[in-house]
Amino acid sequence: MDEEELDHPNASPEKRYFPESLDSSDGDEEGVLACEDLELNPFDGLPYSSRYYKLLKEREELPIWKEKYSFMESLLQNQVVVVSGDSKCGKSSQVPQWCAEYCLSIHYQHGGVICTQAHKQTAVQLALRVADEMDVNIGHEVGYVIPFENCCTTETILRYCTDDMLQREMMSNPFLGSYGVIILDDVHERSLATDVLLGLLKDVLLARPELKLIVNCSPLLTSKLSSYYGDVPVIEVRNKHPVEVVYLSGAQKDSFESVIRLIFEIHRSGEKGDVVVFLACEQDIEKTYELVCQEGSNLNPDVGDLVVIPLYPKEKCSLFRPVDETEKRCQVYQRRVVLTTSCGESLIWSHTVKFVIDVGLERRQVYNPRIRANSLVLQPISQSQAEIRKQLLGSSPSGKLFCLYTEEFASKDMRPLKPAEMQEANLTSMVLFMKRVDIAGLGRCDFMNRPAPESLMQALEDLDYLAALDNDGNLSEFGIIMSEFPLDPQLSKSILASCEFDCVDEMLTIAAMVTAPSCFLHVPHGAEEAAVTCWKTFLHPEGDHFTLINVYNAYQDTVLNSANEHCVEMWCHDCFLSCSALRMADVIRAELLEIIKRIELPYAEPAFGSKENGLNIKKALLSGYFMQIARDVDGSGNYLMLTHKQVAQLHPLSSYSITKKMPEWVLFHQFSISENNYIRVASAVSPELFMQLVPQYYFSNLPPSESKDILQQAAGHLPTETVNKDQDVCDKCPDATEQRCTIQ
C-alpha cells in the first residue's frame, strides 16, 4: 500500500467530478452561498465538519490528486484501469474514495466499492483514515473485513479487506454482485490470493460488463498488468522529490556491523528524521534490536533519545505511523529506528522517515512439493523491492537511502520483479478454493504467472489423501465442508474428524492456537530461566497440542476471574505470554465454533483431561496430519521424516525439549528446512494408532524405509477388525466415506 496519505491531514471545498449528483443547491446565488456555509456530505446527509476541510487540504497535496480528473475519465470509459504510482503517492486512500463518488453518482445500481490489501494492518488503518477523510462513521459508510473480524454493515459503501477475504467471498458469491467497483491494491506484492483474484476477475468481468476493476501497482509491474488485461489505460503518478542513494564501494563484510555503525552515525550527525532498517529475517531484527539497545544506553543525552521499534508484520498491532502532535509537544526530540523485513514494506506510514538502510537480502519461505516442507532461503531482494524502499523517502526533499550492497550487485544479482507467491507456496488451500468455485481445468485458468505443474499435482494428491476429492476429481462432501473453514485443509480435516471422535471443543482450541501468532513471547536475554519456569506450569505430558489447550484454558480462567483487562495483561506479562495472541486465538475459536453451528456439525461437551479424550484428540489430529509424522532414529532427538530423508529436532520451546523426554514417534504441525530444521508443535503418537488412521493408499505410496517397516509390523499386531475398518474408512469409495462421516 502507499501512504503519505496517512500522514497528511488541509484546502478549499472539494471540487467533485459528478456535481449534478452531489449538488444540494437550487442554483440561485443566495442558495449557493447558504449551501457553501453548510455543505452536506452526500454519503450520510450531514453537514461536513471542520476536520473534513482540514484533511481535504492534505489530500490535495498528495501526488495523486492532480490525476483525479484523468482517473475519473478513464473509469467512465473503461472497464479496467491500472493506477501506477510510488508507495507514497496516495493511491490506496484516494482512488477508493473517487470510486465511491462514482458509485454514488449512479445511485449504487451495480453495488459499492471494495478495496483489497495484502496485509490486515493496512486494511484496518486505511479504513480508519478514509472514514476520517470522508467524514463518516467507521463500520457504517466505510468499513473493513479481515480474517476473523468484520467491521461492516449491509449499508457499507466502501470496504477495505484483505485479499484472501474477497477470495473467500467468491465461494458464496462467485460473480461478486455486491460490488460495482473492485480495487486490487498492492498487486506488486504478488500475494497468492491477489494473483488468484487477478485471474478469476477476468472471467467475472466478462460475465458482468458493468463491473469496474482498478488495479493499483508499482511502476515496474505496470506494463505487464496492462497487457495482461488487454492493453488497458494506465494512470501514472510521479513523486516529486529525488532521493540520494548511497551504495557500497566494495564487497560486504559484516551487515550487522554496518547497520549498527550507520544507525549511530546518523543519530550523532544531528540530522533530524526517523530511520527504517530493512533486514533479512525476524531473527536479524531481534539481534539488531538487542545490539542497538545495548549500545544506545551509553549515548550522550545531548544527542537525543534513540527509540528502537521492531516491526513484525505478523502481529496485528504492528504499524509504523507518524507521532501524534500531542505526543510531540510532551517530549524532547526522539529519533525512532524501525527494524523490519521485506514484509514490512507496506507498513511504513510516516513522513518523518528521512533515512532508509537496506541490506538487500531477505529470507523467503519456498515450498518444496517433493518433500512437503518449506525451505528458508536467503536470497537478494528484487529491483522492484529496492525501488519501493527508496520510495519511502519520496516525500522528503533530503532523504537518503543507504544500500549495503554494490550498484553492480543491484543490477546483476537482483531480479527485476518480486517472485509471485504462487510459484513458491503450498497450493493445497488454493486448489481446494478453486475446486469450490468450480473452475474447470486448473491448467487453463489464466494466472499472470502459472504455478508449477508439480506443485499443482502435489496439492491435488494431498486433497485426495484427505478425502476432499471424489473419484472424478471433484470436491467430495468432506471437501465442501473443509472449504467452509478459513484454515489449512489438514486442520479443517482434523476438526471434521473431531466431530466423530467427540473432541470438537478441544480441537477448536488447538486450531485457534496454532492459527493465531505464537502465544509464547520472545524472551529477553537473561530472563530465559524465569520464562521456562513459568511455562512449565502449562506443560502436558501428551505433547505440545495439549500444552496449548492448557495455556488457553488458563487464559480463559484468568479472564473470568479478573476484575479488569489490565489484570489479564499483567497475568500474561508475568507468564511471558502474548496477550494479543491469546485474544486473537479467542476470536478465531469463536468464529470456528460459529461455523460448526452454522453447518450443524455435532458438538460434544468438553472432556479434556480424561485418558479417552486424549486418545480421541490424537485420532482427530492424525486424521488430518498423517502426512506429518517423524521418528526419533537414534534416541537422542534426531527425528527422521516419514515421507523423506530430512532429519529435524524438536523446537526448544517444545514440552519435550523442556522436560528432556523425547518420544519415539511424533505428529507435528510445522517443519521448515533451515539452519536448525526445527519441528514445531509436536505430540507423541504410537505406530499402532497411526496405522489405524492412515489411509492405506497413502501408506502404500510411502518410499521404502526402516520407519515404514516398523509401522508395517505394528499393523500386523492390530486386531483384524481394526485394520479392515480402517481400510473401509480410508477407501475412496463414496459409500465408505458415508459410513465414516457421521456428520453428513
From Swiss-Prot:
Its EC number(s): 3.6.4.13
Region (Disordered): 1-28
CDD domains: DEXHc_DHX32, SF2_C_RHA
GO molecular function: ATP binding; ATP hydrolysis activity; RNA helicase activity
A Pfam short name: OB_NTP_bind
Domain Helicase C-terminal: residue ranges: 258-438
Coarse class of the protein's main subcellular location: nucleus
Cross-referenced InterPro entries: DEAD-box_helicase_OB_fold, HA2_WH, Helicase-assoc_dom, P-loop_NTPase
Motif DEAH box boundaries: 185-188
Gene3D superfamilies, A to Z: 1.20.120.1080, P-loop containing nucleotide triphosphate hydrolases (3.40.50.300)
Compartments reported by the entry: Nucleus; Mitochondrion
Binding site for ATP: 85-92
Keywords: Acetylation, ATP-binding, Helicase, Hydrolase, Mitochondrion, Nucleotide-binding, Nucleus
Broad class of enzyme this protein falls into: hydrolase
Residues that bear N-acetylmethionine: 1
Highest taxon of source: Eukaryota
Family: Belongs to the DEAD box helicase family. DEAH subfamily.
Identification of the protein by name: Putative pre-mRNA-splicing factor ATP-dependent RNA helicase DHX32
Lineage: Eukaryota, Metazoa, Chordata, Craniata, Vertebrata
Gene: Dhx32
